């Protein structure tokens, strides 16, 4: 997802909920003031379809977890926020192994903003997204490698920054507006882009 929750595009929601019954969602986030009330925005579109939905909120920057306790999730959401904090928290081999295992089991993985960025092999961090106000290319989880993504493309007016960043990498950067997304297969190939 190119922006923040909730998912407002009904085409995206239908693609997620029509594929299978969803009983459990795991949301990975990082600690910030008043984080708990915000979490409802990630799940509200699913609650209307699945009223008995179980949801777990995990903050890997403040707690240790046993990933084996979360192998039954149908949907995994990686939240948005401070991109560099998300990268520092979630870009590691253990989390990568968990996400790949869950994708192979058929789980849907949804990243919002920072959570979407870190799914790629390389991460484009816009100058609008860091305190140094510099273009940064960082390592990600490597779930896709034939492109990078730019989030909040429209609201950040990121066209010129994206063009400069593309000179630093040898693959294209796909722009995602706040309410658009790319849908990938489990090998990281683009199935569809929804604007």
Regions found by a protein language model. Give the residues of each.
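Conserved Motif II region of HX4D acyltransferases
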Residues: 83
């Amino acid at each position: 997802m190119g922006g923040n929750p909730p998912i407002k595009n009904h085409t995206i929601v239908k693609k997620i909920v029509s594929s299978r019954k969803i009983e459990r969602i795991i949301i990975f986030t990082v600690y910030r003031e008043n984080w708990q009330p915000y979490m409802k925005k990630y799940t509200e579109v699913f609650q209307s379809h699945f009223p008995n939905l179980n949801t777990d909120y995990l903050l890997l920057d403040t707690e240790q977890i046993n990933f084996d306790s979360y192998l039954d999730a149908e949907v995994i959401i990686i939240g948005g926020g401070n991109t560099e904090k998300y990268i520092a928290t979630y870009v590691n081999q253990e989390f990568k192994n968990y996400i790949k295992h869950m994708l192979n089991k058929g789980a849907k993985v949804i990243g919002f903003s920072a959570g979407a960025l870190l799914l790629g092999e390389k991460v484009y961090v816009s100058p609008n997204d860091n305190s140094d106000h510099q273009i940064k290319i960082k390592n990600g989880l490597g779930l896709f490698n034939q492109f990078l993504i730019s989030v909040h493309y429209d609201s950040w007016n990121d066209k010129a920054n994206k063009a400069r960043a593309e000179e630093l990498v040898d693959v294209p950067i796909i722009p995602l507006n706040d309410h658009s997304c790319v849908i990938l297969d489990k090998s990281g190939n683009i199935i569809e882009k929804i604007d």
